[in-house]
Regions:
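C-terminal extensions of enzymes
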Residues: 1-9, 243, 251-289
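Alpha/beta enzyme core
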Residues: 61, 65, 98-216, 223-246, ...
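A gly/proline- and charged-residue-enriched helix-loop-helix capping module
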Residues: 65-101
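Active-site cofactor/substrate anionic-group-binding motifs, chiefly glycine-
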Residues: 36-76
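Short, charged beta->alpha transition segments
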Residues: 29-37, 71-83, 106
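Active-site metal-binding loops of divalent metal-dependent hydrolases
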Residues: 51, 218-220
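An N-cap/entry alpha-helix motif that binds or orients negatively charged groups
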Residues: 1-42, 280-281
Length: 289
């Protein structure tokens, strides 16, 4: 999809690069990147994205070394168990399977084996190029109705996140349904001409206040990007492609080093803007070109 008209990855990148940061260095104190999430404490608000079809165990091992939370995508229950056994604090994102037994069995396994949250990437229910339901590895997807989502969310004691909520309307519906949070994502450009997740952050934060945890996904290539997202409404960010490249090049240590590099970049921006911690970044430091 790259270089095609309406490439959402390119649109998101261009928007991110249009955001500028105002320096406020006089009187600044050395900041901390500590991140409190679902009763757990982490060294960074930079999380792994809900990736699939890679070495998820290696990714988790690297995240643990960097003090980061982990989200994972497709993979069987055995793989989820192996990831949790690394010591990672894991959010399991589940596909919108047409057969709801597939959903409930994965939720149950996540509950019983120590995941800290579960969720669903609802945006993966519709095929990228036509209005037909998606099919992944022979398993049919289907967009759940509001009532079905309410039942799914209510079936678990774990905090539930919707991945792919990318509008004020969807965010408000997630709050109504009892979600703990949303992951703002265009799913690697699945939808053409998508509004960049970061561009929607301020409006969604204004609409839902503190009712939802907001996690920004898509196009997070540096700690500078993470800073911008945190400044305008995100509680955390997830990173995909840069960590996939680091994992391929140097395994778990590569993931650790990349997360630490991005966290250092984040801390540098926080220091230069008098942001003592991630909860106290003044959104007015962000300017648009």
């Amino acid at each position: 999809m790259a270089n095609l008209p309406g490439d959402s990855i390119q649109i998101a990148r261009e928007y991110m690069d249009s955001l500028l940061v105002e320096s406020r260095i006089i009187g600044a104190v050395r900041p901390t990147s500590r991140f409190e999430f679902l009763g757990e404490s982490f060294d960074t608000p930079i999380m792994t994205a809900a990736l699939s079809h890679i070495d998820l165990v290696g990714m988790a091992e690297g995240a643990v070394k960097a003090g980061a939370a982990v989200s994972i995508g497709m993979g069987d229950n055995d793989t989820l168990g192996e990831v949790i056994n690394t010591g990672a604090k894991v959010m399991k994102i589940i596909k919108p399977y047409e057969n709801h037994d597939e959903i409930y069995s994965r939720i149950k396994f996540a509950e019983e084996n120590g995941a800290i949250a579960v969720g669903m990437d609802v945006e993966h229910s519709i095929h990228a190029g036509d209005p037909e339901p998606d099919n992944i590895h022979g398993l049919q997807m289907k967009l759940p109705s509001m009532d079905e989502l309410r039942e799914i969310i209510g079936s678990t004691k774990l905090p539930f996140f919707i991945k792919g909520a990318l509008s004020v309307q969807d965010a408000e519906r997630c709050a109504e349904l009892g979600c703990r949070g949303i992951i703002l994502s265009h799913h690697n450009g699945l939808m053409r001409y998508a509004v960049p997740p970061v561009r929607l952050l301020p409006k969604i934060r204004e609409a839902v206040g503190d009712k939802l945890i907001l996690i920004a996904d898509g196009g997070m290539e540096s700690g500078f990007d993470a800073f911008k997202a945190l400044a305008i409404g995100a509680d955390a960010v997830t990173v995909g492609r840069p960590l996939m490249a680091a994992l391929k090049e140097n395994g778990a240590d590569g993931v650790r080093d990349k997360i630490k590099e991005m966290t250092d970049q984040l801390l540098a921006m926080m220091y230069r803007t008098s942001s003592a911690d991630i909860r106290h970044i003044d959104p007015s430091v962000i300017w648009e070109k």
